[in-house]
């Protein structure tokens, strides 16, 4: 026989809340579940793509490793010759 009063309360109609509105109901041990992202607003499921570069990380990377800059001098000439051969 299982021990009485050791199991949590089961809520068969627990509300899942995202941005202040109920998006679905499910069974849970909590009456309300607050989430930030769900399938209705996640870019993978909605088909939209958002690229946020708020801190300029890509630009900082390009500057740090010298990508995107024009090549000059002997290296540029050597690479031009290599490209011409292929």
Swiss-Prot record:
Gene Ontology BP terms: translation
Keyword hit for rRNA-binding: yes
SUPFAM superfamilies recorded: L28p-like (SSF143800)
Gene3D superfamilies reported for this sequence: Ribosomal protein L31
Keyword annotations: Ribonucleoprotein, Ribosomal protein, RNA-binding, rRNA-binding
Ribonucleoprotein as UniProt keyword: yes
GO MF entry, a single one: rRNA binding
S-S pairs: none
Residues forming coiled coils: none
Pfam families registered for this protein in UniProt: Ribosomal_L31
Organism domain of life: Bacteria
GO cellular component: ribonucleoprotein complex; ribosome
Family classification: Belongs to the bacterial ribosomal protein bL31 family. Type A subfamily.
Subunit comment: Part of the 50S ribosomal subunit.
Protein role: Binds the 23S rRNA.
Protein name listed in UniProt: Large ribosomal subunit protein bL31
